[in-house]
């Protein structure tokens, strides 16, 4: 998974004990003994995520990414995946697309290697996250594909947090529910701005309970059977003085156990 909320590249290792960590048996494993480009590093690595912690050690090898090939990339070989969460996720490893400031063990980020190799048309990347799922979503390296957007981009400067430039952190001017401002971005330590992290590694909207409570109250209840989905208000985020609407279908999670089961909805 390509995760803008973290900055390390790691893959599950063939050295993972499947009897102790069953999740390793559910994924493709990297075996460095089969690589002629592998170089040992050996430094221990621990990677904390909101979904769980995994650990292992650093290694070096050639990274092939789309049609790019980059030698001597330092990455994590994970041989410990405790907990059920790693068994349930559909991906094998994580490619951190965050800034260097949050990289564990201060290793270079995967995208930093691409920039240093001067292989890109521009030092940018973009995501198109499709409502139809992963099969139709796109990561573009070195720019943005015009087939996936209309109009002009709104450019926003990244912000630091406690002096650390690690997350894709931007300032939000306001949050409106059904066109009404609730003053959610007032009274923050950063002034009258909401600091927001753009994180492709999570599919939910999160925030401080105190700030979210009036927002949730204004949205109202979501029927578990999804029957009132189309009556819910838009959430409008204001960035750089421009409004961006989020329709209910994009902030309500619809899920069902199988094709024969009814849809169930909840805020997300």
Feature map (PLM): residue ranges:
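Aspartyl protease active-site motif detector
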Residues: 1-31, 63, 94-98, 141, ...
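Signature of the N-terminal lobe/flap region of pepsin-like aspartyl proteases
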Residues: 1-82, 86, 90, 218, ...
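Aspartic protease catalytic domain
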Residues: 2, 74-81, 129-133, 190-192, ...
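Short linear motifs in intrinsically disordered
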Residues: 35, 49-55, 116-117, 163-164, ...
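Charged, amphipathic alpha-helical segments
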Residues: 42-48, 106-116, 213-225
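Soluble non-cytosolic domains of exported or imported proteins
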Residues: 53-57, 101, 105, 206
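Generic preference for well-ordered alpha-helical elements
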Residues: 56, 107-108, 168, 209-212
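Aspartyl protease catalytic domain
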Residues: 62-190, 257-268
């Amino acid at each position: 998974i390509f995760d803008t909320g973290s900055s390390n590249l790691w893959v599950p290792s063939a050295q993972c004990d499947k009897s102790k960590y069953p999740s390793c048996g559910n994924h493709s494993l990297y075996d460095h003994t089969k690589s002629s480009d592998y170089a040992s590093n050996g430094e221990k690595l621990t990677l904390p995520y909101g979904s769980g912690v995994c650990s292992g050690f650093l290694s070096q090898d050639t990274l092939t990414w789309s049609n790019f090939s980059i030698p001597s990339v330092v990455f994590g070989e994970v041989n410990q995946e405790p907990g059920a969460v790693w068994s349930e996720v559909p991906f094998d490893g994580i490619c951190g697309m965050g800034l260097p400031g949050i990289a564990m063990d201060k290793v270079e980020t995967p995208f930093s290697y691409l920039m240093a190799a001067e292989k890109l048309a521009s030092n940018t990347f973009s995501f198109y996250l499709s409502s139809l799922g992963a099969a139709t979503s796109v990561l573009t390296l070195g720019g943005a594909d015009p087939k996936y957007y209309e109009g002009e981009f709104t450019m926003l400067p990244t912000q630091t947090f406690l002096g650390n430039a690690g997350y894709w952190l931007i300032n939000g001017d306001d949050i409106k529910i059904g066109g009404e401002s609730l003053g959610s971005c007032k009274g923050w330590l950063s002034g009258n701005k909401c600091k927001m992290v753009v994180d492709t590694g999570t599919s939910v909207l999160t925030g401080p309970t105190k700030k979210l409570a009036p927002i949730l109250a204004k949205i109202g209840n979501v029927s578990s059977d999804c029957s009132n989905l189309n009556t819910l208000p838009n959430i409008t985020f204001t960035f750089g003085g421009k409004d961006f609407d989020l329709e209910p279908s994009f902030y309500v999670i619809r899920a069902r156990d199988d094709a024969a089961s009814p849809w169930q909805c909840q805020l997300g």
